[in-house]
Amino acid sequence: MDELRKLLKEGKLSFQQNFIVAFELFKEMLKNDNKEILILLFINLIATFFSITGNPSLILLSRIMGAVVVIRLWMLYKKVIFKIEERQYVNDGLVIRAVILFCLEVLFIFFMTIIFLHYIFTLPEGREILLTLDYRRILFLLRVPIIIVGIIFFIGYIYILYLLPVYLSRRGSFWESVKYNLYLLKGNRIRMLIPMILFFVIEMVMVQLLLKLGILGLFINVFLETAIKVYKVITASIIYLNVEYTSQIPEEFFYLTGKEEQNSDVIEDKAEA
């Protein structure tokens, strides 16, 4: 990992370099550090199997397992970043942080659902259409609010591009992490945004194509989706560390990055000398 850290500190990586370096680390983790990846794959497979049984209880359980996958995937940020930095991985409050982020996401989805339902009920025959569960008709009725919410979500998203790796791998409160994320965004927004959009498009296209294969495609999608999501976390972690290493970090953020401790160690060494 010394060579990787050296590369990340030498200068800003190009768009292609980010993916190449991330893929090399992805291969290394598949070979030598694949426990978490296998756990994610196993949970995803079981959740997918439960979702197609038609049993309401198992379908509900599959949704819960899906939430577990998201939380564990987010926790992977710290594991990847600490692996690169060759620091001892300690799951100290990480689960709570990941759960907090997940709850915020659920709260946002719940809030948007309430808005959409209210919008439908204000339309003529909206209640009847909702009760028929005609999803195509419902989506057609919601096309305008969906576009508006999509735009709002995108605008919000471009202001939190570095929040996940920061909050899940560094110290500090949620709002301190938000502030540090905003600092890292200065001049570095596109570096994270374009790869994340690319991953999103690939996932959407892949799902649409594989679902045409029926159940077989559904399970193939589980393997590919798990691999892509892990690769996405690694790529985002690489970009984040590269930005952090090549940026002049203000003293107010030293505590988050651990530089405060490094500086104190240097002072102590000089005093002993």
Task: Report residues per predicted region.
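Juxtamembrane transition segments at transmembrane-helix termini in multipass membrane proteins
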Residues: 2-9, 64-89, 156-174, 184, ...
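Interfacial aromatic "cap" segments that immediately flank transmembrane helices
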Residues: 6, 10-47, 89-111, 155-207
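Low-complexity, intrinsically disordered/propeptide-like segments
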Residues: 26-28, 53, 256-259
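Membrane-helix interface segments in multi-pass membrane proteins
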Residues: 44-69, 88-95, 109-154, 203-229, ...
